[in-house]
Swiss-Prot record:
InterPro entries: 4-PPantetheinyl_Trfase_dom, 4-PPantetheinyl_Trfase_dom_sf, ACPS, Ppantetheine-prot_Trfase_dom. The keyword Transmembrane does not apply. The keyword Transferase applies. It is an enzyme of class 2 (transferase). Its cofactor is Mg(2+). This is Holo-[acyl-carrier-protein] synthase. One of its GO terms (biological process) is fatty acid biosynthetic process. One of its GO terms (cellular component) is cytoplasm. Transfers the 4'-phosphopantetheine moiety from coenzyme A to a Ser of acyl-carrier-protein. Its EC number is 2.7.8.7. It is found in: Cytoplasm. It holds the Pfam family ACPS. Keywords: Cytoplasm, Fatty acid biosynthesis, Fatty acid metabolism, Lipid biosynthesis, Lipid metabolism, Magnesium, Metal-binding, Transferase.
Amino acid sequence: MIVGLGTDIVEIARIADKVPAAGDEAALAKCPLAKRVLTQAEMAIFVASSQPGRYLAKRFAAKEAAAKALGTGIGRGVSFQHIEISNDANGAPLIAFQGGAAERLSLLGGSRAHLSIADEKHYATATVILESN
């Protein structure tokens, strides 16, 4: 049974304008928006990315969609740091919850999360579906 559904869309340029140029690893590692949104594991990928603005926009959209699926949004016991986005060996996106996000998922009776991320020239979008057993 579906216990949560969230979607988000982000204008990539809005995020990319706040991100230093690719290749400037020192500046990227200090990027305030990235430090707020990304976990340590995500930050390592961001710093090495050839398109850091696009990478951050996609992660931002995914985490906002997840927070909406949890029914809280960001800031009501759930932070960006409580949600981690990674990829499996085939490149499919995976989502993991810690802290307040994991607590909220448990409260909803959720046991599985499905994530889809898409991007085009100007926009990144994500949808999260939470399921119970």
